[in-house]
């Protein structure tokens, strides 16, 4: 069998390699995306921030890239600076291990033609959130954070030369319903069941409260209540999400074990999960609203 000349082999290889890089990148205009209609807005002393989070499907529709599959969750922010000074946004306050736009683009360069790689890098660079907002102007863009299930909770720290501002956002995502949304908290206890106490009285009542959860039949003893929260529902949720506890979706497999534990004849009012630092397993936090109040703040019993 005659041998192919080396020059021909090189040509064939070059054609094969160039033929693999045929993907084309073309992103949609952000203003045409549906997620911008779901913004959550906050304002402090002349700084207005609008925040929203696109779903995995919306990211694919906009960019053709499945960022969620790689654990990347874009957060879109619009900053209106109505002050007389520059405003600086601390991107690390949103996620202290956020991905830079060019880092994201670099991770998806494989398989694209040279001009498409350049277009991708340009789009990610231009659509990233600028750090500095001139006085009287508005800027918008993405910050690429680590993906978490459920409500997206994050801070946005803003600075001028003379002041600092902290914004805390909780942005719900379509299609995710946390388990605690199924609970009618106002109907859990009758008015005559509510016990209002001060802190010394709380210690006394807790000493008399069941030590542990029960099974559905109220016969077998479950895990002990080893955590107590005194907080309004909003304050408790904020504290948990800021501490990186993740909500559990209603009826999900993740909450199956938690639903075997009962207090006052019901499963946990809310179950939250948190990954251990080494990623080996998840910690679980089960929470029930108790009939005890300290002032206007409800008391919650929990297992961790």
Where are these regions (language model features)?
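The feature marks short-to-medium sequence segments in extracytoplasmic or secretory-pathway proteins
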Residues: 82-134
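Short, hydrophobic/aromatic beta-strand segments
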Residues: 85-93, 154-156, 237-242
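Surface-exposed edge beta-strand/loop patches
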Residues: 21-28, 126-193
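Terminal, regulation- and interaction-focused segments at domain boundaries
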Residues: 209-239
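Short, solvent-exposed beta-strand/turn "edge" segments of beta-rich domains on protein surfaces
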Residues: 59-76, 82-86, 132-134, 217-218
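C-terminal motif of bacterial Sec signal peptides marking the signal peptidase cleavage site
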Residues: 17-19
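A cross-kingdom signal targeting lumenal/periplasmic-facing segments of multi-pass membrane
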Residues: 73, 80, 251-304
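Low-complexity, acidic Ser/Thr/Pro/Gly-rich terminal tails and inter-domain linkers that flank the onset
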Residues: 28-69, 186, 206
